[in-house]
């Protein structure tokens, strides 16, 4: 809550468009606080250009840091320069394997990356549904064992959160991931389908689209995507990439 208030204050005084990224309530001590933060953001939007983005998972991913480990329920190591073969393993299991404390295990692995399980579904759903929220992947392509959001974010929103859970209609789900983002970041002629716009298109089946990537197998292809166009050129079809680089 303090950080959101600080951001709103800076945005108001600087009079610049501001994006709160990636809005979440991490750590059990913060669960439920999205009720307050979203009210603060909604009120601030009346007088400021204030937006927020989020991703559709209750686990985050960044460098392996002791401060982050302390507030997470579970930690998976995504990569380690010193131990490249341990990608995807549980930090607690590695601690037992090495016969070291968690802190010393982190020192042994560092530099390294990790996935932190530290958010609550109710907060996530509330933030996803917030009218002003954009949805992105925040994926990190270079990780040896990436967060599944890298491969599954957008089909997950369309399949799980829109079709199955009905948090918002299909057209709103699409807008949160395309038109809204293009508008906020000033990407002219992108994000919407219109005459004269760049033809960035995804052809998908709304009845079957769903993510398959998991924390155990994070690179599984999603289902229900028939083809993808970038600048009018087909870059994905028949469940595989083409050679086009538009």
Where are these regions (language model features)?
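Active-site neighborhoods of metal-dependent hydrolases
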Residues: 4, 8-12, 16-166
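Divalent metal-coordination and catalytic microenvironments
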Residues: 53, 99, 138, 173, ...
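Structured C-terminal cores of nucleic-acid metabolism proteins
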Residues: 161, 173-176
């Amino acid at each position: 809550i303090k950080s959101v208030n600080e951001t709103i204050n800076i945005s108001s005084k600087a009079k610049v468009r501001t994006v709160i990224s990636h809005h979440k309530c991490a750590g059990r001590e913060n669960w439920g606080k999205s009720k307050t933060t979203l009210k603060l953001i909604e009120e601030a939007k009346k007088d400021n250009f204030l937006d927020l983005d989020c991703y559709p998972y209750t686990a985050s991913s960044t460098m392996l840091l002791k401060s982050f480990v302390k507030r997470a329920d579970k930690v998976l190591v995504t990569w380690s320069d010193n131990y490249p073969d341990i990608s995807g393993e549980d930090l607690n299991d590695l601690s037992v394997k090495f016969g070291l404390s968690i802190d010393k295990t982190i020192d042994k692995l560092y530099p390294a990356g990790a996935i932190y399980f530290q958010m609550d579904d109710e907060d996530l759903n509330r933030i996803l549904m917030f009218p002003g929220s954009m949805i992105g992947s925040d994926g990190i392509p270079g990780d040896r064992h990436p967060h599944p959001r890298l491969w599954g974010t957008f089909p997950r929103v369309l399949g799980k959160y829109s079709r199955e859970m009905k948090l918002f209609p299909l057209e709103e789900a699409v807008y949160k991931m395309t038109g809204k983002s293009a508008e906020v970041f000033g990407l002219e002629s992108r994000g919407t389908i219109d005459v004269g716009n760049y033809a960035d298109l995804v052809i998908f089946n709304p009845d079957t689209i769903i993510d398959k990537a998991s924390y155990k197998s994070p690179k599984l292809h999603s289902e229900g995507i028939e083809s993808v166009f970038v600048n009018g050129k087909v870059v994905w079809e028949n469940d595989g990439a083409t050679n086009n680089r538009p």
